[in-house]
Amino acid sequence: MKNINPTHTQAWKSLEAHKAELSNTTIQDLFKQEKNRFDDYSLTFNNQILVDFSKNNINQTTLSHLRQLAQECALDSAKEAMFTGEKINRTENRAVLHTALRNRTNTPVLVDGKDVMPEVNAVLAKMKDFCQRIISGEWKGYTGKAITDVVNIGIGGSDLGPYMVTEALRPYKNHLNMHFVSNVDGTHIAETLKKVNPETTLFLVASKTFTTQETMTNAQSARDWLLKAAKDESAVAKHFAALSTNAKDVEKFGIDTNNMFEFWDWVGGRYSLWSAIGLSIALSIGFENFEALLNGAHEMDKHFRTTPIEKNIPTTLALVGLWNTNFLGAQTEAILPYDQYLHRFAAYFQQGNMESNGKYVDRDGNVINNYQTGPIIWGEPGTNGQHAFYQLIHQGTTLIPCDFIAPAQSHNPLADHHNKLLSNFFAQTEALAFGKTKEEVEAEFVKAGKSLDDVKNIVPFKVFTGNKPTNSILVQKITPFTLGALIAMYEHKIFVQGVIFNIFSFDQWGVELGKQLANRILPELTDSEKVASHDSSTNGLINQFKAWR
C-alpha cells in the first residue's frame, strides 16, 4: 500500500479551486441545473439497497476530481492489498482480512503463503454444530435443563457488533434470550444476572487473549455467581464457552477447550462480528441466518472490489464524506436510522469509524496538520432524534452531514405507523436540502390571515437556510442479507477514507495510554492512604474518592 499525502496530489489542488467555484451554489441551485439529478446521483445494490447522494453540494466536476483523488492515492492497489492478505496494518505487522471471514466462494486467501480459508471454514462448522446443540436443547446445564438465556461478555468489538446485529435482527430471533455485558462497572453484570437462572444460562466469554480486564472481571463474577448456585466446579464447563485463542487460560478457567472458538490476529475487534465473536448472533437468529448475514457482506465485498469507481457505492460515500469534511468544513457526521431495530447502528459505526480513522499521524510517521481525518460519528433512531437534536442540524451554526437509513418494508406493519415514519424520513432530507426562505415564511403568515407588520419580528426565527447535505439509504427490508451488505458498505467507506487520509485504519494505539495509567492507579485504590504521585487534579480526585467510598 503506497504512502501518498493527499494534499500533494493534483486532484486535491483541483478540489480546492473547485470549492471556490461552488461557494455560491446551493443544493437547490444544483437541482435546478440538473433535471435528472436523482438518476445521476443515486446507486443501487442488488435491487435491495438504494443510495441517493443527490442532496449533497456536489456536481459532476466535484465527483470527477474526487475520483481522480482516489486514483492518485492508489485506492485500487490498496483494495487488492487488503483483499489478498498483504500486511497493510504495518504498525502491528498484520493482514486485514475480515473479508475472508465471509468469503463465501472459498477463493484461497493467503497470509504468509498459507490459505486461511480451511481454518475459517472449520470454525464456522464448529459454530454451526454448537448452535444446533444449544438451540435444539440437546446441550444441558448442570441440572439437566436446556439453555434459555445466553450472556455475551465482551467489550468494544466483542460487544458492540454482536449486540447491534442481534437487535437489528430481532424479527429473526428464536426462543433464546440474549444479554450483553461489557462495562466493568459491577452494575452491568449484577443487573443482568438478576434476569437469568444459573441452571439455564450460557455465558460466552469473548476475549482473544482471555486477559482483557473488563471482560475477565465480568467473567469471573459470572463464574462466582454460577458456582454459588451449583456448588460444583464441573458446572463451569456446562455453562461457559470461550471466543479466544488462549487455550491454556480458557482451560484454567474451567471451560472445555472443545467449546473454545478461535479467531486470528488478522481480525480486528471492530471487524470481528463475522468471526467466532459472532457466535451470539448465530445463537440468536440461527446459523442459516448468520450465513445469510455473511452472504450479504460478501456480495458487498464483491461490489466494492470489482465495480468501477463511478458506480461503486462505498467509494462514492467515502469521497462525498471526504468532500464534506475537508472542503466544506464539517467535523461530524450523523447516522440516523428510521428503524427502531437499528437503534445501535450509529453506536457501532461510531467505534468503527472513530477507532479506525481517529488518527493524527500519517503512514510515514508525520503529524497531519493540513487536512482532517476521521469525523465524529453519532446518531439516534428517527423519529426520536427529531424531537431532540435535529433543531441544531436544521438551524445551528455547525454543518452536520447526515445519513438517513430506512426500510421500505417494516417487520411490524401496524396500522399506518410505517407510512408516518417514512413520511418523516423523506421530509427531513427535503427540509435540510431546500429549507424555507423568508418569503415563504411571510407567505404562510399572510395565508393564515396575519399582517406582515405583526409578524416581522418572528419571521427570522422561522427561516431555514437549507443547503445541509444528506445521503438517503433506502433498504427494501432489513434482513440478514441486507444488514450484512449495509455493514460491509460502511466498513469499506471507512477503508477508502483511511487510504486517502494516508493513515493506518486498523490499529488503535489511542486506547492504550489510558489502560496503562489505569493499571498504575488501580493498586493505589486498595487502601485509604492519600496519594501524591500524580498531578494535583488526579491526586485530588483519587483522595476525594477514598474519603467518600
From Swiss-Prot:
GO BP annotations listed: gluconeogenesis; glucose 6-phosphate metabolic process; glycolytic process
Alphabetical list of InterPro entries matching this protein: G6P_Isomerase, G6P_Isomerase_C, Phosphoglucose_isomerase_CS, SIS_dom_sf, SIS_PGI_1, SIS_PGI_2
Designated name of the protein: Glucose-6-phosphate isomerase
Species per Swiss-Prot/TrEMBL record: Haemophilus influenzae (strain 86-028NP)
Species classification: Bacteria, Pseudomonadati, Pseudomonadota, Gammaproteobacteria, Pasteurellales
MF terms in GO: carbohydrate derivative binding; glucose-6-phosphate isomerase activity; monosaccharide binding
GO CC terms, sorted: cytosol
Main function: Catalyzes the reversible isomerization of glucose-6-phosphate to fructose-6-phosphate.
Pathway the protein contributes to: Carbohydrate biosynthesis; gluconeogenesis; Carbohydrate degradation; glycolysis; D-glyceraldehyde 3-phosphate and glycerone phosphate from D-glucose: step 2/4
Keyword Transport: no
Encoding gene, per UniProt annotation: pgi
